[in-house]
C-alpha cells in the first residue's frame, strides 16, 4: 500500500485554531510529509468524547488490562484521564496504515505497531520543539519492556511509553469520523495517535 501524508480540509474553527497558536504548523506539516503518515488533522480537545464504555472494553476484552503502565487501571480513572487531556487545548491526530496478510492474526497485526510508535515518537518531538510540554497517546499496550514494572515499580521508560488512546476512555472512531479520517478495513491496519499540546 502506498503511504501518503494527507492534510484533511480545515473548516471554520480549525482556521481560527491555527491562527491562535504560536506553533509553526507549516514546519511540522513539512516534516510530517517525510513520514509514512496517511492522514492527519489539528483538533480542539473539547471535541473529544470520553466514555466509561470504552474503558469497559479494555477491562473485559483486552488481555493487557492491569498489566502495564500504559493501560488501565495504571493510567487512572476515565475522569482523571479526561482532566489530564483537557489541560491541553489542542491536539494533532494522525494515522499510519499497513497491510497484513490476515488481520485476524493478532501477532502479525501487533508486529506492525512498532513502526507506528516510532512515527509517533518523531511527531511528538516535532510538536515538543514548538510547544514544550506534550501528552502523547498512541496504540494498544506499551511493549517497550519484555516485562512491565507495573504495579511493583515505576515505569522504566516514561519518556518513551505512550498510553493507549482507548485507555483514556477516548472514543477514537468518533473524532476520526468527524474529521474524515478513514479506517479502510479488510487486511489494512490503521494505527491512530494523538499528540496534545497547548
List each model region and its residues.
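Short, Lys/Arg-enriched N-terminal segments with co-localized hydrophobic residues
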Residues: 10-22
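Short, conserved charged micro-motifs
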Residues: 21-27, 103-104
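N-terminal domain-onset segments
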Residues: 26-41
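Catalytic cores of enzyme domains
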Residues: 38-68, 72-198
